[in-house]
Amino acid sequence: MRRREFIAALGGAASAWPHAAQGQATPKTHVVLWVSTEAQPDPFIASFREGMRERGYVEGQNLAFVLRYAPGDPARLREALPELLGVPADFIVSSGPAILAMRAATGKPVLFAVSGDPVALGIAESLARPGRNFTGTTFMSLDVAQKRVQLLKELLPGMSKLAILSQKNHPGEQSEHEATRAAADALSISLAYIPFAAGPELDGALQRVAEAGANAMLVFPDGVTMVHRAKIADFALSRRLP
């Protein structure tokens, strides 16, 4: 599914919550707290606004946004948690590492999109029956983690060592690591596992990748690596590292 279609779908899910204003002469303004570790301008919010508009929720008429950003730094959101929880929002929209801070928002509906495991993150009891006050979707697929290794091997038949760059606090990261290792073992590929915890540690992690002597690099996707994707791509190009 294309990103625009997906976020429009999220808008539809969000619109199912606020029914209190129906039948009122003066429409209620529904307040959305948008919490993100994306860099500004946020690539997702324009599509979300459009999806909400298509369902009758128009910013400036019956919809308002409160925007809070901490690009690549979820710790800043955790520090700002008292302020965030004090925002008089009808529901919260969040994604990626920002969800870690939103776990404390137990009194409001939270709409999420994550690349990790919602169960490991602690925001869902199971994928089939999430429970709690969170709803959304995950892009995580352990089958895809294995396919990435297989694809690299097809592109580089002589590959014997693969560097794994991973933001270690990403929920579900351990499962993704295990699935990748199993695929690598099946193809007789050794792994150089290089974890880091946050954006400020990325330079050191990339230096360890350079020193690993790997034939290729695999980056586990999450909000932090997405924010720093240009730096990671420039590094790979400079090292001629697939």
Predicted regions and their residues:
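Short hydrophobic alpha-helices and adjacent helix-cap/hinge residues
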Residues: 1-242
